[in-house]
UniProtKB/Swiss-Prot annotation:
Annotated GO MF terms: protein-disulfide reductase activity
One annotated GO biological process: protein import into mitochondrial intermembrane space
Quaternary structure and interacting proteins, as annotated: Monomer.
Provenance organism: Candida albicans (strain SC5314 / ATCC MYA-2876) (Yeast)
Name under which the protein is recorded: Mitochondrial intermembrane space import and assembly protein 40
Length: 252
């Protein structure tokens, strides 16, 4: 009985071993087949990795290029903006300068026209024979009567001071004098005028004192008075030449 069991066991073991051997032989891979599969796996993984990194590198390069392009556009926009602002400023400056030139020209034209109108009005209102640019009160003589206008500002107000009468006599004598040198025959009248000035130094300080407190001579006083009333003398002498002023006109 023991033998029978032993044989049976041995038979089972052999059958199992044979079956396992066949299974191993059908599933076992040879070294060459294994190496080929390993190489394919490595190459596939490398290709995938290269593709991935190539794609990432391309994305990085594209992003960098896009940033550079954007930077260039920003710089270009800034330059264009500065150029436009500069152009606008220049145009505004030119416009203002043109406006100022136009305004100056218009003002000059208006001023010229205004002066011309004033001159025309004066010319139209001025009596014939009256010195140009002077009204009756400002003329040295009255063209209607031919008399000296003692109210003329050109006489310096000396005809109405404390020594007004003495001034009128001396002045009338000088402007109508026909001697050479002119006025030499009026010395006595100028001496009388100077004597009157000395009585009223507060009124005739400028005429009576020459450069300080020293009293001026009759000749100096005469010179100062005639120099002050020189515009009136010129007008009256011209009026005498044109026979518009009466010789030896008596003072008021």
């Amino acid at each position: 009985m023991y033998r029978t069991i032993s044989r049976s066991s041995s038979g089972l073991i052999r059958q199992s071993t044979a079956r396992l051997t066949r299974q191993l032989s059908t599933t076992r891979t040879t070294p060459s087949q294994y190496n080929s599969k390993l190489l394919l796996g490595v190459l596939g993984t490398g290709a995938l990795a290269f593709g991935y990194f190539s794609q990432q590198s391309s994305l990085i390069q594209n992003a960098s290029t896009a940033e550079n392009i954007e930077k260039v556009f920003e710089e270009g926009n800034a330059v264009a903006k500065d150029a436009q602002e500069s152009l606008d400023a220049r145009q505004e400056k030119v416009i203002k300068e043109n406006e100022q030139k136009t305004k100056k020209a218009e003002d000059a034209k208006t001023s010229s026209e205004s002066k011309a109108n004033v001159a025309d009005k004066k010319s139209n209102s001025q009596p014939e024979g009256e010195p140009e640019g002077e009204g009756k009160q400002e003329a040295a003589f009255n063209p209607d009567t031919g008399e000296i206008n003692w109210d003329c500002p050109c006489l310096g107000g000396m005809a109405h001071g404390p020594c007004g009468e003495e001034f009128k006599e001396a002045f009338s004598c000088f402007v109508f004098s026909e001697t050479e040198p002119k006025g030499i025959d009026c010395i006595k009248k100028f001496e009388n005028m100077r004597s009157c000035f000395k009585r009223y130094p507060e009124h005739y300080k400028d005429e009576l004192y020459d450069d300080g407190e020293e009293e001026a001579s009759t000749e100096v006083v005469e010179h100062v008075v005639l120099e002050t009333s020189e515009p009136a003398i010129e007008q009256i002498e011209q009026g005498i030449k044109e026979d518009k002023v009466k010789p030896n006109t008596k003072s008021d």
